[in-house]
């Protein structure tokens, strides 16, 4: 018996009846020969980790644009925190950890530079709108691997597509990632806001802190434990009413004090202008994009290809392209022998 087959048999023996089983996957868009060692969900996880889009997450904004300091979250550290929380919950509920981890690692692959600021601009400019969850699917189906995509399983793509608020993942593993995403960003955005002096610990609503905890780690522990004990033996993943209400009131507090009305957002309009002007420039000058995006423009149209190009940019690369295109180069940077 192959190692993969042993692992698949163990899933039936050890996992919850509500867990997704590798052998029962709805499969891939293109059939592939099975791996002797890894299950299909394990292969998906590995493909995501080795993708270029995953590596670029390290230079994409989470909340704070161009923060001064080495300890602020990026889109990559957020992704890793989501994966850690999700695996803890999945293991406790005896769900499929490999599927959970693959969804968690891939859930933000389509995020724009400058966080949700970049997403707002592309959503305004594209006729059909722009959502990072849908772009994440486009990354794994079309943009990665020289246009062939990663050919992920249906279950992983379903979890990625439906991870945002309002989505309805078809697997419990997808539900775990959806709730873990909220737990991660609510807590680490508070941590970053305090580090950036946007908030002080005493600013946090006392009634909510009394329920959830007065420290970063304590709040995460409270939420994770609540999800686990409230979901055991059930065909859905959720928080208890008390913790859910406290968590979402804390989220509303963040929207008011950090995401919308704080000095942390002072550069947001500048970032939006960068994305907008890059979009218009490349829309009018398709030939200035890398050749793979010129090819995409021929297949999917200019608007879609330009959005694909810009959405894949890191903050640093977007600013570099903006500087190259729109800002004059000082003459003293030139070699005098070129004059």
Curated annotation (Swiss-Prot):
Signal sequence segment: none
InterPro entries named among the record's database cross-references: dGTPase (IPR006261), Diverse_Catalytic_Enzymes (IPR051094), dNTPase_2 (IPR023023), HD/PDEase_dom (IPR003607), HD_domain (IPR006674), PHydrolase_assoc_dom (IPR026875)
A Pfam match: HD
Stretches that traverse the bilayer: none
Keyword hit for rRNA-binding: no
SMART domains for the chain: HDc
Boundaries of every HD domain copy: 75-186
Database matches in PROSITE patterns: HD (PS51831)
Molecular functions (GO terms): triphosphoric monoester hydrolase activity
UniProt KW Hydrolase keyword: yes
Keywords on record: Hydrolase
Cross-referenced HAMAP family: dGTPase_type2
Family, as annotated: Belongs to the dGTPase family. Type 2 subfamily.
Protein name: Deoxyguanosinetriphosphate triphosphohydrolase-like protein
Native source species: Caldanaerobacter subterraneus subsp. tengcongensis (strain DSM 15242 / JCM 11007 / NBRC 100824 / MB4)
